[in-house]
Protein backbone atom coordinates (compact mmCIF):
# COMPACT_ATOMS: atom_id res chain seq x y z
CA UNK A 1 0.00 0.00 0.00
CA UNK A 2 1.07 3.56 -0.62
CA UNK A 3 -0.80 5.07 2.30
CA UNK A 4 1.26 7.55 4.31
CA UNK A 5 2.05 6.14 7.73
CA UNK A 6 0.80 9.17 9.70
CA UNK A 7 -2.49 10.18 8.07
CA UNK A 8 -5.49 12.20 9.15
CA UNK A 9 -9.02 13.13 8.15
CA UNK A 10 -10.62 16.51 8.82
CA UNK A 11 -14.04 17.30 10.31
CA UNK A 12 -15.17 13.88 11.54
CA UNK A 13 -18.31 13.67 13.67
CA UNK A 14 -18.37 11.14 16.53
CA UNK A 15 -20.97 10.19 19.14
CA UNK A 16 -20.19 9.27 22.73
CA UNK A 17 -21.76 6.58 24.90
CA UNK A 18 -24.25 9.18 26.18
CA UNK A 19 -25.18 10.03 22.57
CA UNK A 20 -23.44 13.39 22.69
CA UNK A 21 -22.17 14.54 19.29
CA UNK A 22 -18.58 15.76 18.98
CA UNK A 23 -16.76 17.19 15.98
CA UNK A 24 -13.14 16.13 15.61
CA UNK A 25 -11.33 18.87 13.74
CA UNK A 26 -8.59 16.37 12.93
CA UNK A 27 -8.94 12.60 13.29
CA UNK A 28 -5.38 11.22 13.13
CA UNK A 29 -4.52 7.74 11.90
CA UNK A 30 -1.38 5.67 11.66
CA UNK A 31 -0.89 2.79 9.23
CA UNK A 32 1.66 0.13 10.21
CA UNK A 33 2.68 -3.04 8.45
CA UNK A 34 1.77 -6.29 10.18
CA UNK A 35 5.45 -7.21 10.50
CA UNK A 36 6.18 -3.90 12.21
CA UNK A 37 3.35 -4.42 14.68
CA UNK A 38 4.48 -7.95 15.47
CA UNK A 39 8.03 -6.71 16.00
CA UNK A 40 6.74 -4.01 18.32
CA UNK A 41 5.46 -6.57 20.85
CA UNK A 42 8.60 -6.19 22.93
CA UNK A 43 9.64 -3.72 25.57
CA UNK A 44 12.04 -1.14 24.18
CA UNK A 45 14.66 0.55 26.33
CA UNK A 46 15.60 4.19 26.19
CA UNK A 47 18.97 3.17 24.73
CA UNK A 48 17.23 1.52 21.76
CA UNK A 49 15.13 4.63 21.29
CA UNK A 50 18.20 6.87 21.38
CA UNK A 51 19.94 4.73 18.76
CA UNK A 52 16.90 5.08 16.50
CA UNK A 53 16.45 8.84 16.81
CA UNK A 54 20.14 9.79 16.80
CA UNK A 55 20.32 10.07 12.97
CA UNK A 56 17.37 12.49 13.01
CA UNK A 57 19.28 14.95 15.23
CA UNK A 58 22.45 15.26 13.16
CA UNK A 59 20.99 18.12 11.13
CA UNK A 60 19.88 20.21 14.09
CA UNK A 61 20.52 23.92 13.81
CA UNK A 62 19.67 27.07 15.71
CA UNK A 63 16.80 28.11 13.45
CA UNK A 64 14.38 28.83 16.30
CA UNK A 65 13.54 32.29 17.58
CA UNK A 66 16.70 33.79 19.16
CA UNK A 67 16.73 33.74 22.94
CA UNK A 68 16.78 36.91 25.00
CA UNK A 69 16.54 36.51 28.75
CA UNK A 70 15.84 40.22 29.23
CA UNK A 71 12.67 40.30 27.10
CA UNK A 72 9.53 41.38 28.97
CA UNK A 73 6.29 39.44 28.83
CA UNK A 74 4.46 39.80 25.55
CA UNK A 75 4.44 38.47 21.97
CA UNK A 76 8.26 38.32 21.81
CA UNK A 77 8.43 36.22 24.98
CA UNK A 78 5.68 33.95 23.65
CA UNK A 79 7.66 33.36 20.46
CA UNK A 80 10.76 32.42 22.46
CA UNK A 81 8.73 30.16 24.76
CA UNK A 82 7.39 28.22 21.78
CA UNK A 83 8.90 24.80 21.25
CA UNK A 84 12.05 24.98 19.08
CA UNK A 85 12.29 22.69 16.03
CA UNK A 86 14.46 20.13 17.82
CA UNK A 87 11.95 19.78 20.68
CA UNK A 88 9.10 19.36 18.18
CA UNK A 89 11.15 16.69 16.40
CA UNK A 90 11.67 14.84 19.68
CA UNK A 91 7.96 15.03 20.50
CA UNK A 92 7.04 13.62 17.08
CA UNK A 93 9.49 10.75 17.47
CA UNK A 94 8.18 9.86 20.92
CA UNK A 95 4.56 10.01 19.75
CA UNK A 96 5.28 7.71 16.78
CA UNK A 97 7.40 5.27 18.76
CA UNK A 98 4.85 3.52 20.99
CA UNK A 99 5.69 -0.11 21.61
CA UNK A 100 2.83 -2.60 21.89
CA UNK A 101 2.51 -3.97 25.43
CA UNK A 102 -0.17 -5.80 27.40
CA UNK A 103 -0.14 -3.04 30.02
CA UNK A 104 -0.86 -0.23 27.56
CA UNK A 105 -3.78 -1.32 25.41
CA UNK A 106 -3.97 2.09 23.72
CA UNK A 107 -0.90 0.96 21.78
CA UNK A 108 -2.85 -1.97 20.31
CA UNK A 109 -4.25 -1.65 16.78
CA UNK A 110 -7.93 -0.76 16.60
CA UNK A 111 -8.47 -2.02 13.04
CA UNK A 112 -6.83 -4.30 10.52
CA UNK A 113 -6.70 -3.43 6.82
CA UNK A 114 -6.16 -6.55 4.71
CA UNK A 115 -4.99 -5.62 1.21
CA UNK A 116 -4.67 -7.97 -1.77
CA UNK A 117 -3.99 -7.18 -5.41
CA UNK A 118 -6.52 -8.44 -7.92
CA UNK A 119 -3.62 -9.34 -10.23
CA UNK A 120 -2.45 -12.12 -7.92
CA UNK A 121 -2.82 -15.80 -8.84
CA UNK A 122 -5.27 -16.60 -5.99
CA UNK A 123 -6.58 -13.44 -4.27
CA UNK A 124 -9.16 -15.25 -2.13
CA UNK A 125 -6.54 -17.58 -0.71
CA UNK A 126 -4.33 -14.56 -0.05
CA UNK A 127 -7.14 -12.97 1.96
CA UNK A 128 -7.55 -16.19 3.94
CA UNK A 129 -3.84 -16.27 4.77
CA UNK A 130 -3.89 -12.62 5.86
CA UNK A 131 -6.92 -13.30 8.04
CA UNK A 132 -5.18 -16.18 9.80
CA UNK A 133 -2.05 -14.10 10.33
CA UNK A 134 -4.05 -11.21 11.76
CA UNK A 135 -5.74 -13.45 14.34
CA UNK A 136 -2.44 -13.78 16.23
CA UNK A 137 -1.41 -10.13 15.95
CA UNK A 138 -4.41 -8.27 17.36
CA UNK A 139 -7.37 -8.48 19.71
CA UNK A 140 -10.15 -10.92 18.90
CA UNK A 141 -12.84 -8.26 18.40
CA UNK A 142 -10.76 -6.01 16.14
CA UNK A 143 -12.32 -4.42 13.08
CA UNK A 144 -11.15 -6.00 9.82
CA UNK A 145 -11.52 -4.22 6.49
CA UNK A 146 -10.75 -5.84 3.14
CA UNK A 147 -9.31 -3.85 0.25
CA UNK A 148 -8.93 -5.09 -3.33
CA UNK A 149 -6.23 -3.22 -5.23
CA UNK A 150 -6.53 -2.85 -8.98
CA UNK A 151 -3.05 -2.11 -10.31
CA UNK A 152 -3.68 -0.20 -13.53
CA UNK A 153 -0.01 -0.36 -14.51
CA UNK A 154 -0.12 -4.17 -14.79
CA UNK A 155 -3.81 -5.07 -15.23
CA UNK A 156 -4.92 -2.20 -17.45
CA UNK A 157 -7.97 0.00 -17.06
CA UNK A 158 -10.53 -2.84 -17.26
CA UNK A 159 -11.80 -3.39 -13.69
CA UNK A 160 -14.38 -6.09 -14.45
CA UNK A 161 -12.21 -8.86 -12.95
CA UNK A 162 -11.54 -6.75 -9.86
CA UNK A 163 -15.26 -6.02 -9.41
CA UNK A 164 -16.07 -9.74 -9.61
CA UNK A 165 -13.41 -10.41 -6.99
CA UNK A 166 -14.87 -7.67 -4.77
CA UNK A 167 -18.32 -9.30 -4.91
CA UNK A 168 -16.81 -12.64 -3.91
CA UNK A 169 -14.94 -11.04 -1.00
CA UNK A 170 -18.15 -9.37 0.22
CA UNK A 171 -20.00 -12.68 0.19
CA UNK A 172 -17.18 -14.29 2.19
CA UNK A 173 -16.17 -11.62 4.72
CA UNK A 174 -19.04 -9.13 4.89
CA UNK A 175 -19.60 -5.58 3.78
CA UNK A 176 -16.36 -4.02 5.07
CA UNK A 177 -14.79 -4.26 1.61
CA UNK A 178 -13.65 -1.77 -1.02
CA UNK A 179 -11.98 -1.56 -4.42
CA UNK A 180 -9.18 0.92 -5.08
CA UNK A 181 -7.57 1.47 -8.52
CA UNK A 182 -3.99 2.75 -8.29
CA UNK A 183 -0.84 3.35 -10.37
CA UNK A 184 -2.50 5.10 -13.29
CA UNK A 185 0.29 7.69 -13.57
CA UNK A 186 2.72 8.03 -16.44
CA UNK A 187 5.80 7.11 -14.44
CA UNK A 188 8.32 8.32 -11.92
CA UNK A 189 8.69 12.02 -11.30
CA UNK A 190 5.00 12.86 -11.58
CA UNK A 191 3.37 15.69 -9.69
CA UNK A 192 1.47 13.16 -7.57
CA UNK A 193 4.69 11.61 -6.31
CA UNK A 194 5.87 15.06 -5.26
CA UNK A 195 2.63 15.62 -3.34
CA UNK A 196 3.20 12.45 -1.32
CA UNK A 197 6.89 13.12 -0.72
CA UNK A 198 6.22 15.45 2.23
CA UNK A 199 3.93 12.92 3.89
CA UNK A 200 6.52 10.17 3.53
CA UNK A 201 9.35 12.42 4.72
CA UNK A 202 8.37 11.97 8.37
CA UNK A 203 10.77 9.51 10.04
CA UNK A 204 9.39 6.04 10.75
CA UNK A 205 11.30 4.69 13.73
CA UNK A 206 10.20 1.10 13.16
CA UNK A 207 11.45 0.80 9.59
CA UNK A 208 14.45 1.81 7.53
CA UNK A 209 14.00 5.01 5.50
CA UNK A 210 12.83 4.67 1.92
CA UNK A 211 15.30 5.35 -0.83
CA UNK A 212 14.58 7.97 -3.45
CA UNK A 213 14.26 7.20 -7.13
CA UNK A 214 11.89 4.91 -9.04
CA UNK A 215 11.34 2.78 -5.90
CA UNK A 216 9.97 5.76 -3.97
CA UNK A 217 6.40 5.01 -2.79
CA UNK A 218 3.83 6.53 -5.07
CA UNK A 219 6.10 6.85 -8.09
CA UNK A 220 3.32 5.67 -10.44
CA UNK A 221 0.41 7.44 -8.78
CA UNK A 222 -1.58 10.10 -10.57
CA UNK A 223 -3.47 12.99 -9.02
CA UNK A 224 -6.68 10.98 -9.50
CA UNK A 225 -5.10 8.09 -7.58
CA UNK A 226 -4.22 10.40 -4.69
CA UNK A 227 -7.77 11.75 -4.64
CA UNK A 228 -9.11 8.18 -4.53
CA UNK A 229 -6.67 7.31 -1.72
CA UNK A 230 -7.80 10.23 0.38
CA UNK A 231 -11.45 9.46 -0.31
CA UNK A 232 -10.87 5.86 0.73
CA UNK A 233 -9.18 6.92 3.99
CA UNK A 234 -12.06 9.26 4.80
CA UNK A 235 -14.68 6.61 4.08
CA UNK A 236 -12.68 4.10 6.11
CA UNK A 237 -12.86 6.48 9.07
CA UNK A 238 -16.42 7.76 8.76
CA UNK A 239 -18.20 4.60 7.57
CA UNK A 240 -16.21 1.82 9.24
CA UNK A 241 -13.87 2.91 12.02
CA UNK A 242 -15.97 5.53 13.84
CA UNK A 243 -19.18 3.43 13.86
CA UNK A 244 -17.14 0.47 15.14
CA UNK A 245 -15.68 2.58 17.96
CA UNK A 246 -19.08 4.01 18.88
CA UNK A 247 -20.78 0.59 18.98
CA UNK A 248 -18.04 -0.96 21.09
CA UNK A 249 -17.96 1.97 23.51
CA UNK A 250 -21.71 1.72 24.15
CA UNK A 251 -21.58 -2.07 24.53
CA UNK A 252 -18.57 -2.05 26.84
CA UNK A 253 -20.00 0.82 28.87
CA UNK A 254 -23.08 -1.24 29.70
CA UNK A 255 -21.00 -4.33 30.50
CA UNK A 256 -18.46 -2.54 32.68
CA UNK A 257 -21.12 -0.64 34.63
CA UNK A 258 -22.95 -3.90 35.29
CA UNK A 259 -19.80 -5.77 36.29
CA UNK A 260 -18.54 -3.04 38.60
CA UNK A 261 -21.94 -2.56 40.21
CA UNK A 262 -22.15 -6.28 40.89
CA UNK A 263 -18.61 -6.35 42.28
CA UNK A 264 -19.30 -3.36 44.54
CA UNK A 265 -22.50 -4.97 45.86
CA UNK A 266 -20.65 -8.17 46.70
CA UNK A 267 -17.90 -6.27 48.46
CA UNK A 268 -20.32 -4.08 50.43
CA UNK A 269 -22.25 -7.15 51.49
CA UNK A 270 -19.08 -8.60 53.00
CA UNK A 271 -18.63 -5.54 55.23
CA UNK A 272 -16.74 -2.23 55.25
CA UNK A 273 -13.47 -3.84 56.35
CA UNK A 274 -13.43 -6.11 53.33
CA UNK A 275 -14.29 -3.16 51.08
CA UNK A 276 -11.44 -0.98 52.34
CA UNK A 277 -8.78 -3.68 52.28
CA UNK A 278 -9.83 -6.19 49.68
CA UNK A 279 -7.59 -8.90 48.21
CA UNK A 280 -6.45 -8.76 44.59
CA UNK A 281 -9.37 -8.64 42.19
CA UNK A 282 -10.37 -11.88 40.49
CA UNK A 283 -8.48 -12.49 37.30
CA UNK A 284 -5.25 -10.70 38.16
CA UNK A 285 -2.22 -12.95 37.69
CA UNK A 286 0.45 -11.68 40.10
CA UNK A 287 3.14 -14.03 38.77
CA UNK A 288 2.76 -12.88 35.16
CA UNK A 289 1.78 -9.33 36.17
CA UNK A 290 -1.14 -9.47 33.78
CA UNK A 291 -4.90 -8.98 33.74
CA UNK A 292 -6.68 -11.49 31.48
CA UNK A 293 -8.71 -9.84 28.72
CA UNK A 294 -11.98 -11.03 30.31
CA UNK A 295 -11.26 -9.48 33.72
CA UNK A 296 -13.15 -6.43 34.95
CA UNK A 297 -10.01 -4.28 35.01
CA UNK A 298 -9.01 -5.21 31.46
CA UNK A 299 -12.53 -4.49 30.19
CA UNK A 300 -12.51 -1.16 32.00
CA UNK A 301 -9.20 -0.21 30.40
CA UNK A 302 -10.55 -1.18 26.99
CA UNK A 303 -13.59 1.03 27.55
CA UNK A 304 -11.35 3.93 28.59
CA UNK A 305 -9.32 3.61 25.40
CA UNK A 306 -12.44 3.55 23.22
CA UNK A 307 -13.80 6.62 24.98
CA UNK A 308 -10.48 8.37 24.44
CA UNK A 309 -10.62 7.60 20.71
CA UNK A 310 -14.08 9.19 20.32
CA UNK A 311 -13.10 12.24 22.46
CA UNK A 312 -15.36 11.22 25.36
CA UNK A 313 -12.78 12.49 27.83
CA UNK A 314 -15.06 12.53 30.87
CA UNK A 315 -15.87 8.82 30.61
CA UNK A 316 -12.27 8.03 29.69
CA UNK A 317 -10.96 9.82 32.79
CA UNK A 318 -13.40 7.96 35.04
CA UNK A 319 -12.41 4.59 33.61
CA UNK A 320 -8.65 5.29 33.67
CA UNK A 321 -9.01 6.35 37.30
CA UNK A 322 -10.86 3.11 38.11
CA UNK A 323 -8.17 1.03 36.40
CA UNK A 324 -5.45 2.90 38.25
CA UNK A 325 -7.12 2.31 41.62
CA UNK A 326 -7.54 -1.41 40.84
CA UNK A 327 -3.91 -1.72 39.79
CA UNK A 328 -2.62 0.12 42.86
CA UNK A 329 -4.65 -2.19 45.11
CA UNK A 330 -3.34 -5.25 43.25
CA UNK A 331 0.26 -3.91 43.34
CA UNK A 332 0.34 -4.00 39.53
CA UNK A 333 2.74 -1.08 39.19
CA UNK A 334 3.07 -1.22 35.41
CA UNK A 335 -0.70 -1.17 34.89
CA UNK A 336 -1.05 1.64 37.44
CA UNK A 337 1.59 3.76 35.72
CA UNK A 338 0.15 3.17 32.23
CA UNK A 339 -3.37 4.05 33.39
CA UNK A 340 -2.01 7.05 35.30
CA UNK A 341 -0.29 8.33 32.16
CA UNK A 342 -3.51 8.22 30.17
CA UNK A 343 -5.48 9.71 33.09
CA UNK A 344 -2.97 12.57 33.15
CA UNK A 345 -3.31 13.27 29.41
CA UNK A 346 -7.09 12.94 29.47
CA UNK A 347 -7.57 15.31 32.39
CA UNK A 348 -5.11 17.76 30.84
CA UNK A 349 -7.20 17.74 27.66
CA UNK A 350 -10.38 18.34 29.72
CA UNK A 351 -9.16 20.93 32.24
CA UNK A 352 -5.51 21.91 31.75
CA UNK A 353 -5.66 24.31 34.70
CA UNK A 354 -6.40 21.58 37.26
CA UNK A 355 -4.18 22.03 40.30
CA UNK A 356 -3.36 18.36 40.88
CA UNK A 357 -2.07 17.49 37.40
CA UNK A 358 1.58 18.16 38.22
CA UNK A 359 1.30 15.99 41.33
CA UNK A 360 -0.20 13.20 39.22
CA UNK A 361 2.70 13.56 36.78
CA UNK A 362 5.18 13.13 39.64
CA UNK A 363 3.36 10.01 40.83
CA UNK A 364 3.35 8.49 37.34
CA UNK A 365 7.04 9.26 36.86
CA UNK A 366 7.92 7.65 40.18
CA UNK A 367 5.98 4.52 39.24
CA UNK A 368 7.67 4.31 35.85
CA UNK A 369 11.08 4.87 37.48
CA UNK A 370 10.46 1.85 39.71
CA UNK A 371 9.75 -0.42 36.72
CA UNK A 372 12.67 -2.12 34.94
CA UNK A 373 13.04 -0.38 31.59
CA UNK A 374 10.51 2.30 32.50
CA UNK A 375 12.71 5.29 31.67
CA UNK A 376 11.42 5.53 28.11
CA UNK A 377 7.79 5.45 29.28
CA UNK A 378 8.60 8.11 31.87
CA UNK A 379 10.09 10.28 29.16
CA UNK A 380 7.07 9.76 26.90
CA UNK A 381 4.60 10.67 29.65
CA UNK A 382 6.49 13.85 30.52
CA UNK A 383 6.94 15.03 26.92
CA UNK A 384 3.36 14.31 25.84
CA UNK A 385 1.97 16.01 28.95
CA UNK A 386 4.13 19.07 28.30
CA UNK A 387 2.88 19.16 24.71
CA UNK A 388 -0.76 19.14 25.88
CA UNK A 389 -0.10 21.91 28.40
CA UNK A 390 1.70 23.99 25.79
CA UNK A 391 -1.52 24.27 23.79
CA UNK A 392 -3.24 26.16 26.65
CA UNK A 393 -0.57 27.54 27.26
CA UNK A 394 0.49 26.75 30.84
CA UNK A 395 4.22 27.28 30.64
CA UNK A 396 4.97 26.53 34.28
CA UNK A 397 3.53 23.02 33.90
CA UNK A 398 5.40 22.68 30.59
CA UNK A 399 8.70 23.47 32.29
CA UNK A 400 7.93 21.15 35.20
CA UNK A 401 7.13 18.24 32.88
CA UNK A 402 10.22 18.74 30.72
CA UNK A 403 12.45 18.85 33.80
CA UNK A 404 10.95 15.56 34.99
CA UNK A 405 11.66 14.06 31.60
CA UNK A 406 15.23 15.38 31.59
CA UNK A 407 15.98 13.37 34.73
CA UNK A 408 15.58 10.13 32.76
CA UNK A 409 17.14 11.32 29.49
CA UNK A 410 20.72 11.20 28.27
CA UNK A 411 22.93 12.82 25.66
CA UNK A 412 21.36 15.36 23.31
CA UNK A 413 17.85 14.50 24.49
CA UNK A 414 18.58 15.90 27.94
CA UNK A 415 19.89 19.14 26.46
CA UNK A 416 16.77 19.48 24.30
CA UNK A 417 14.47 19.04 27.30
CA UNK A 418 16.47 21.44 29.47
CA UNK A 419 16.39 24.12 26.78
CA UNK A 420 12.66 23.55 26.31
CA UNK A 421 12.11 24.10 30.04
CA UNK A 422 14.26 27.24 29.94
CA UNK A 423 12.21 28.63 27.06
CA UNK A 424 8.97 27.77 28.88
CA UNK A 425 9.98 29.86 31.90
CA UNK A 426 10.29 32.87 29.58
CA UNK A 427 6.64 32.58 28.56
CA UNK A 428 5.22 33.20 32.04
CA UNK A 429 3.41 36.49 32.77
CA UNK A 430 6.49 37.41 34.82
CA UNK A 431 9.37 35.64 33.01
CA UNK A 432 11.71 33.71 35.31
CA UNK A 433 14.97 34.86 33.76
CA UNK A 434 17.25 33.49 36.48
CA UNK A 435 15.68 30.03 36.35
CA UNK A 436 15.88 30.09 32.58
CA UNK A 437 19.55 31.11 32.70
CA UNK A 438 20.41 28.26 35.05
CA UNK A 439 18.71 25.72 32.80
CA UNK A 440 20.38 27.15 29.71
CA UNK A 441 23.76 26.68 31.39
CA UNK A 442 22.96 23.00 31.93
CA UNK A 443 21.61 22.62 28.40
CA UNK A 444 24.71 24.23 26.89
CA UNK A 445 26.97 21.90 28.88
CA UNK A 446 24.96 18.89 27.67
CA UNK A 447 25.07 20.08 24.05
CA UNK A 448 28.82 20.58 24.33
CA UNK A 449 29.28 17.02 25.60
CA UNK A 450 27.30 15.73 22.59
CA UNK A 451 29.27 17.85 20.07
CA UNK A 452 26.18 19.94 19.21
CA UNK A 453 28.25 23.12 18.90
CA UNK A 454 25.61 25.22 17.13
CA UNK A 455 22.99 24.62 19.80
CA UNK A 456 25.49 25.12 22.61
CA UNK A 457 26.66 28.45 21.18
CA UNK A 458 23.07 29.65 20.79
CA UNK A 459 22.41 28.99 24.49
CA UNK A 460 25.71 30.52 25.61
CA UNK A 461 25.21 33.59 23.42
CA UNK A 462 21.90 34.33 25.14
CA UNK A 463 23.55 33.80 28.52
CA UNK A 464 26.44 36.15 27.69
CA UNK A 465 24.02 38.93 26.77
CA UNK A 466 22.04 38.32 29.97
CA UNK A 467 25.02 38.23 32.34
CA UNK A 468 26.34 41.44 30.78
CA UNK A 469 23.51 43.18 32.60
CA UNK A 470 23.97 41.34 35.91
CA UNK A 471 26.51 41.66 38.69
CA UNK A 472 27.73 38.06 38.40
CA UNK A 473 31.23 38.35 36.91
CA UNK A 474 32.16 34.74 37.64
CA UNK A 475 29.22 33.38 35.63
CA UNK A 476 29.87 35.89 32.86
CA UNK A 477 33.50 34.79 32.62
CA UNK A 478 32.46 31.13 32.61
CA UNK A 479 30.10 31.71 29.67
CA UNK A 480 32.67 33.74 27.70
CA UNK A 481 35.35 31.11 28.24
CA UNK A 482 33.12 28.33 26.90
CA UNK A 483 32.07 30.48 23.96
CA UNK A 484 35.75 30.99 23.15
CA UNK A 485 36.45 27.27 23.32
CA UNK A 486 33.52 26.45 21.04
CA UNK A 487 34.56 29.12 18.54
CA UNK A 488 38.12 27.77 18.60
CA UNK A 489 36.87 24.21 18.04
CA UNK A 490 34.84 25.46 15.07
CA UNK A 491 37.89 27.14 13.52
CA UNK A 492 36.69 30.71 14.16
CA UNK A 493 39.93 32.04 15.66
CA UNK A 494 39.11 35.75 15.50
CA UNK A 495 35.81 35.25 17.31
CA UNK A 496 37.50 33.08 19.93
CA UNK A 497 40.07 35.84 20.53
CA UNK A 498 37.27 38.38 20.90
CA UNK A 499 35.78 36.38 23.75
CA UNK A 500 39.14 35.64 25.41
CA UNK A 501 40.28 39.25 25.37
CA UNK A 502 37.20 40.18 27.42
CA UNK A 503 38.48 37.83 30.12
CA UNK A 504 41.68 39.84 30.68
CA UNK A 505 40.74 41.69 33.85
CA UNK A 506 41.50 41.38 37.57
CA UNK A 507 40.37 37.94 38.73
CA UNK A 508 41.55 35.09 40.99
CA UNK A 509 45.00 33.81 40.04
CA UNK A 510 43.88 30.31 39.00
CA UNK A 511 41.17 31.59 36.66
CA UNK A 512 43.45 34.28 35.21
CA UNK A 513 46.14 31.69 34.49
CA UNK A 514 43.62 29.43 32.70
CA UNK A 515 42.30 32.31 30.62
CA UNK A 516 45.79 33.52 29.68
CA UNK A 517 46.92 30.02 28.72
CA UNK A 518 43.90 29.65 26.44
CA UNK A 519 44.53 33.11 24.97
CA UNK A 520 48.15 32.25 24.18
CA UNK A 521 47.10 28.93 22.65
CA UNK A 522 44.48 30.49 20.38
CA UNK A 523 46.76 33.38 19.42
CA UNK A 524 49.19 30.93 17.83
CA UNK A 525 46.68 30.22 15.05
CA UNK A 526 45.64 33.83 14.38
CA UNK A 527 46.61 35.21 10.97
CA UNK A 528 46.64 38.81 12.18
CA UNK A 529 46.72 39.56 15.87
CA UNK A 530 44.99 42.87 16.42
CA UNK A 531 42.90 43.10 19.51
CA UNK A 532 42.01 45.82 21.97
CA UNK A 533 42.15 44.87 25.63
CA UNK A 534 39.34 46.04 27.89
CA UNK A 535 41.97 47.48 30.27
CA UNK A 536 44.97 49.14 28.50
CA UNK A 537 48.32 47.68 29.48
CA UNK A 538 49.96 51.16 29.22
CA UNK A 539 48.27 54.39 30.30
CA UNK A 540 50.32 57.11 28.61
CA UNK A 541 49.05 59.91 30.84
CA UNK A 542 50.28 58.13 33.96
CA UNK A 543 53.72 57.13 32.61
CA UNK A 544 56.97 58.99 33.37
CA UNK A 545 60.56 58.56 32.13
CA UNK A 546 63.14 58.94 34.92
CA UNK A 547 66.88 58.61 35.08
CA UNK A 548 68.44 56.00 37.31
CA UNK A 549 69.87 58.72 39.54
CA UNK A 550 66.35 59.91 40.26
CA UNK A 551 65.21 56.54 41.62
CA UNK A 552 64.72 56.22 45.34
CA UNK A 553 67.73 54.86 47.23
CA UNK A 554 65.83 51.76 48.34
CA UNK A 555 65.12 50.94 44.70
CA UNK A 556 68.79 51.45 43.76
CA UNK A 557 69.94 49.07 46.54
CA UNK A 558 67.44 46.49 45.40
CA UNK A 559 68.65 46.77 41.82
Regions found by a protein language model. Give the residues of each.
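Extended alpha-helical assembly domains of large eukaryotic scaffold proteins
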Residues: 261, 265, 269, 273-558
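Eukaryotic intrinsically disordered, low-complexity segments enriched for acidic and Ser/Thr/Pro residues
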Residues: 1-282, 433, 438-440, 453, ...
